[in-house]
Amino acid sequence: MSYIEKIDKNRIPQHIAIIMDGNGRWAKQRGKERTYGHQAGAETVHKIIEDAARLGVKYLTLYTFSTENWNRPQEEVAALMNLLVDSIEEETLMKNNIRFRIIGDIKKLPAEVQEGLSRCIEHTANNTGTCLVLALSYSSRWEMTEAVRQIATLAKTGEISPEQITDEYITAHLTTNFMPDPDLLIRTGGEIRLSNYLLWQCAYSELYFCDTFWPDFDKEEFCKAIYEYQQRERRFGKTSEQIS
């Protein structure tokens, strides 16, 4: 029986976050340039977005471009920016009733990229299905630094007192404040680390790591991750007896 058949359709994770890793190594195995891998990875993005929408995932957050990725070779960054504009298919989003959002330091993106993304956000704003969130020019340390800076400014001007700064207050000042924390974090490509991604939000997320490079990640592997998630007991610091 395939994992597509095994999963419980009534217990799909509300929020799935993915670190899409392995494009470059996938291309290298085939004697191709890294950009070839990124192009193949973009095709996988389209498929997984549609799979998530059909399964009823409420939020799908994809680690698309980190703040550290700006340090990559200039030609690779330029190719990624061009691919980003071309790969956001508004028609697919509208067909699947998908709402589009972005988190990250987007002011660093090229103007034409910002304009294209803003149009897509505006045009899909009233969609009520899966919310697709791209983490662009994003890192958790950047996000938390921005939140601390905002809160420190409010404290300096006397708008808040230190006693008002709670877990919830900090969460409200993060770029992800419009969605719940991830239930499941998936990382492809064989690496076992979080790479500065949603560190605050993934405090109690279930983690799934697989060796599959992102271009080869398909619906079966996606459903395997969901199945593994469904086999786990989420305790959030409590005992099994407390949550049963």
Curated annotation (Swiss-Prot):
Note describing how the cofactor binds: Binds 2 magnesium ions per subunit.
Residues of the active site: 21, 69
UniProt-annotated binding residues for Mg(2+): 21, 206
Binding site for substrate: 22-26, 34, 38, 66-68, 70, 72, 187, 193-195
InterPro entries attached to this UniProt entry: UPP_synth-like (IPR001441), UPP_synth-like_CS (IPR018520), UPP_synth-like_sf (IPR036424)
GO BP term, example: polyprenol biosynthetic process
Cofactor(s) the protein requires to work: Mg(2+)
PROSITE patterns: UPP_SYNTHASE
Keywords: Magnesium, Metal-binding, Transferase
Enzyme Commission (EC) number: 2.5.1.-
The protein's assembly and partners: Homodimer.
Family membership: Belongs to the UPP synthase family.
NCBIfam families: PRK14830.1 (NF011405), PRK14838.1 (NF011411), uppS (TIGR00055)
Record's function text: Catalyzes the condensation of isopentenyl diphosphate (IPP) with allylic pyrophosphates generating different type of terpenoids.
Name of the protein described by the UniProt record: Isoprenyl transferase
Organism encoding this protein: Bacteroides thetaiotaomicron (strain ATCC 29148 / DSM 2079 / JCM 5827 / CCUG 10774 / NCTC 10582 / VPI-5482 / E50)
Encoding gene, per UniProt annotation: uppS
